[in-house]
Amino acid sequence: MQKRLHYSSLEINRRAEELIQHSANRYRITVQIANRAKQRRGLEASEDLDDLPLKPVIRAIIEMSDEVAQPELLADS
C-alpha cells in the first residue's frame, strides 16, 4: 500500500485543529506533537534518511490525527 507523501497546508491545518479539539488541553497536545516530532527527527538523523519529503512536525500531526480518527491503528501495536 502506497501512502500519499504530499499534503496540502489546508489539510495539515484541519488535522491540527482536530487534534486540538479532541484534546482537553491545547498546551499538552502541542507539547505531545513537538515531542513526537523531536523523536522522529532523532530517529531519522540516526538512520540518515535525507530523502523523506515530510518534515517531522508535519509527520507527527498526520500520525497523531490518524491515531485519533482510527483507534484500531493502536490496537495492533
UniProtKB/Swiss-Prot annotation:
Top-level taxonomic group: Bacteria
EC number: 2.7.7.6
Gene Ontology cellular component annotations, sorted alphabetically: DNA-directed RNA polymerase complex
Reactions that this protein is recorded to catalyse: RNA(n) + a ribonucleoside 5'-triphosphate = RNA(n+1) + diphosphate
GO molecular function: DNA binding; DNA-directed RNA polymerase activity
InterPro entries: DNA-dir_RNA_pol_omega, Pol_omega/Rpo6/RPB6, RPB6/omega-like_sf
Claim: Glycoprotein is one of the keywords in the record: no
UniProtKB keywords: DNA-directed RNA polymerase, Nucleotidyltransferase, Transcription, Transferase
Swiss-Prot/TrEMBL GO biological process terms: DNA-templated transcription
Enzyme class label: transferase
Purpose: Promotes RNA polymerase assembly. Latches the N- and C-terminal regions of the beta' subunit thereby facilitating its interaction with the beta and alpha subunits.
Similarity section: Belongs to the RNA polymerase subunit omega family.
Self-association state and partner proteins as the record states: In cyanobacteria the RNAP catalytic core is composed of 2 alpha, 1 beta, 1 beta', 1 gamma and 1 omega subunit. When a sigma factor is associated with the core the holoenzyme is formed, which can initiate transcription.
HAMAP family in alphabetical order: RNApol_bact_RpoZ
Protein name: DNA-directed RNA polymerase subunit omega
Gene for this chain: rpoZ
